[in-house]
UniProtKB/Swiss-Prot annotation:
CDD domains: EFh. The modification Cysteine sulfenic acid (-SOH) is found at C39. GO terms for cellular component: dendrite; membrane; perikaryon; photoreceptor inner segment; photoreceptor outer segment. Ca(2+) binds at T116. It comes from the Eukaryota. Ca(2+) 2 binds at D110, D112, N114, E121. Acts as a calcium sensor and regulates phototransduction of cone and rod photoreceptor cells. Modulates light sensitivity of cone photoreceptor in dark and dim conditions. In response to high Ca(2+) levels induced by low light levels, prolongs RHO/rhodopsin activation in rod photoreceptor cells by binding to and inhibiting GRK1-mediated phosphorylation of RHO/rhodopsin. Plays a role in scotopic vision/enhances vision in dim light by enhancing signal transfer between rod photoreceptors and rod bipolar cells. It comes from Homo sapiens. This is Recoverin. A lipid is attached at G2 (N-myristoyl glycine). Ca(2+) 1 binds at D74, N76, D78, T80, E85. It is found in: Photoreceptor inner segment; Cell projection, Cilium, Photoreceptor outer segment; Photoreceptor outer segment membrane; Perikaryon.
């Protein structure tokens, strides 16, 4: 499943990535060359991923969020991402289809990987998101969601859960699709992320 360490992206991986993402062959090949230059082993570590993420958010602390994003895409749990996992991470966090993004968001919020989400896991991810919001932007948030605790509480109430309840993937996806307010609360301003990536 991994990539060859030569300078060419395998035809199978290229076709699979084109099919599953919005990226062109030219973009993928160019990114692959850059990826190999920065990661000659053909794999990116969590620390390297966090460094790349930090470039997009120089005025905040994206380390915790980047760590959770990395975990959610490290499908074989080897502590690295190959090029395919890396591109899918980029795609899902910027332009994936809504259902795919929600499946990914569930895996992001399912911190312990047990197949359900607890209120504490929601709080952990929301705290990581808040570290990426500038103090000026936090001041613009409504009073009932201007701290991680308030936002986590608001999300949990939208799902109609008690503090010690768990949320399944099905409930998470259906609840989010049925309520645009939940979608807004669980994500980190994807439009700003897209703009930063385009200008990088």
């Amino acid at each position: 499943m991994g990539n060859s360490k030569s300078g060419a992206l395998s035809k199978e991986i290229l076709e699979e990535l084109q099919l599953n993402t919005k990226f062109s062959e030219e973009e993928l090949c160019s990114w692959y060359q850059s990826f190999l230059k920065d990661c000659p082993t053909g794999r990116i570590t969590q620390q390297q991923f966090q460094s790349i993420y930090a470039k997009f958010f120089p005025d905040t602390d994206p380390k915790a969020y980047a760590q959770h994003v990395f975990r959610s895409f490290d499908s074989n749990l080897d502590g690295t991402l190959d090029f395919k996992e890396y591109v899918i991470a980029l795609h899902m966090t910027t332009a994936g289809k809504t259902n795919q993004k929600l499946e990914w968001a569930f895996s992001l919020y399912d911190v312990d990987g047990n197949g359900t989400i607890s209120k504490n896991e929601v709080l952990e991810i929301v705290m990581a998101i808040f570290k990426m919001i500038t103090p000026e932007d936090v001041k613009l948030l409504p009073d009932d969601e201007n701290t991680p605790e308030k936002r986590a509480e608001k999300i949990w109430k939208y799902f109609g859960k008690n503090d010690d309840d768990k949320l399944t993937e099905k409930e998470f996806i259906e609840g989010t699709l049925a309520n645009k307010e939940i979608l807004r609360l669980i994500q980190f301003e994807p439009q700003k992320v897209k703009e930063k990536m385009k200008n990088a």
